[in-house]
């Protein structure tokens, strides 16, 4: 039943909605899938490991479902707009427009295709660059969230093309004031704890991988009390 599917999602903390759980159920019940599973010695039901793996790869953190969704937006003036994928409309399109405008002077060699972006540096060398945010993980576990963020940035240039040589890390951090003295909602860590944990996590992640952090920026604004910006790159 629908309730049974939702219970599986809740009990396993899969964070999958009914539509997603129904898709998994239909896949598992497909006759061809059942035959393949039997051929490799798997049972008819999805295992806990399979459910967990699918839930992780379908999570907002990995899949960016909000970025890909159809969004109906209305501003404070009453103007309405339907956006089919924020990512395609406002990130990929802007990049494509800039590349088109530059024409033969476009230096982009690989964009939105591999694990990191690649631009032409000179006739002999290309520059590989990967940046990403790790905001929610760092809000929950500042040290671990920041460390996994920076080593993920280390990992991706390694896996771009035939592999890149890593040179340095960079970062931008935005936090509420470390002297913040207003009430915080339940489960939110104090900005000072987030600040100190994030800085240490990025430092350890880079140094223990042998990749120095050569520059960075700090911004303090109390609007970041709800969620910090932890923006790292390699």
Name every feature range the model reports, one short phrase each.
Residues 1-234:
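Core nucleic-acid recognition elements
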